[in-house]
């Protein structure tokens, strides 16, 4: 063991949820309309963007994943707004003396189009995290009809977070 404490930590997060009927389609705290009236299946609101960011934040500090803190076996988290969960995760991060340097996320979905909603997603996330929205990058792509996203069986998100130790 040494006494080295890094100034930066990076975390990677990933989430995917199945598209189903009878559920809302919440991404980045925005209720989107799928052309086939599909939503994301999950214990909470199944917000893949917010979930992948939470996992990236937790992973950067080796704190486990969101299932450790908000297990699907606990009815307390049933249908909960994922932005509420994100606020709890960022509190954990800040209690350890870290701050977000930046977030970069890629949503993978054939439909609906995500780009028109990116700015409001960034606003929702920046308000929850209490950071400038310029620290958040959100991109969207299709999977070119390949894999579960391409077959419109689900929507996924990859996120990377860079944390900086505060003095």
From Swiss-Prot:
Residue numbers binding 4-CDP-2-C-methyl-D-erythritol 2-phosphate: 15-17, 43-44, 65-67, 141-144, 151
MF (Gene Ontology): 2-C-methyl-D-erythritol 2,4-cyclodiphosphate synthase activity; metal ion binding
Regions crossing the membrane: none
Domain of life: Bacteria
Pathway linked to the protein: Isoprenoid biosynthesis; isopentenyl diphosphate biosynthesis via DXP pathway; isopentenyl diphosphate from 1-deoxy-D-xylulose 5-phosphate: step 4/6
Cofactor annotation remark: Binds 1 divalent metal cation per subunit.
Catalytic activity: 4-CDP-2-C-methyl-D-erythritol 2-phosphate = 2-C-methyl-D-erythritol 2,4-cyclic diphosphate + CMP
Top-rank EC class of the record's enzyme: lyase
EC number: 4.6.1.12
Cofactor(s) in the UniProt record: a divalent metal cation
Record site: Transition state stabilizer: 43, 142
Keywords assigned by UniProt, alphabetized: Isoprene biosynthesis, Lyase, Metal-binding
Gene Ontology terms: biological process: isopentenyl diphosphate biosynthetic process, methylerythritol 4-phosphate pathway; terpenoid biosynthetic process
Binding site for a divalent metal cation: 15, 17, 51
Quaternary structure and interacting proteins, as annotated: Homotrimer.
Similarity section: Belongs to the IspF family.
Physiological role: Involved in the biosynthesis of isopentenyl diphosphate (IPP) and dimethylallyl diphosphate (DMAPP), two major building blocks of isoprenoid compounds. Catalyzes the conversion of 4-diphosphocytidyl-2-C-methyl-D-erythritol 2-phosphate (CDP-ME2P) to 2-C-methyl-D-erythritol 2,4-cyclodiphosphate (ME-CPP) with a corresponding release of cytidine 5-monophosphate (CMP).
Family annotation (NCBIfam families): ispF (TIGR00151)
Protein name: 2-C-methyl-D-erythritol 2,4-cyclodiphosphate synthase
Organism: Prochlorococcus marinus (strain MIT 9312)
Record lineage: Bacteria, Bacillati, Cyanobacteriota, Cyanophyceae, Synechococcales
């Amino acid at each position: 063991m040494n006494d080295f404490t890094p100034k930066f930590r990076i975390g990677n997060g990933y989430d995917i949820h199945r598209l189903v009927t009878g559920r809302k389609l919440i991404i980045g705290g925005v209720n989107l309309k799928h052309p086939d009236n599909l939503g994301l299946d999950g214990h909470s609101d199944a917000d893949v963007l917010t979930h992948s960011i939470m996992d990236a934040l937790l992973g950067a500090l080796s704190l486990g994943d969101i299932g450790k803190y908000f297990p699907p076996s606990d009815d307390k988290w049933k249908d909960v707004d994922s932005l509420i969960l994100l606020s709890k995760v960022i509190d954990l991060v800040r209690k350890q003396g870290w701050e977000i340097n930046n977030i970069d996320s890629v949503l993978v979905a054939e439909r609906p189009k995500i780009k028109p909603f990116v700015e409001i997603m960034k606003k929702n996330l920046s308000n929850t995290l209490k950071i400038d929205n310029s620290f958040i990058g959100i991109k969207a792509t299709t999977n070119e009809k390949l894999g579960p996203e391409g077959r419109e069986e689900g929507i996924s998100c990859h996120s990377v977070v860079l944390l900086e130790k505060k003095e």
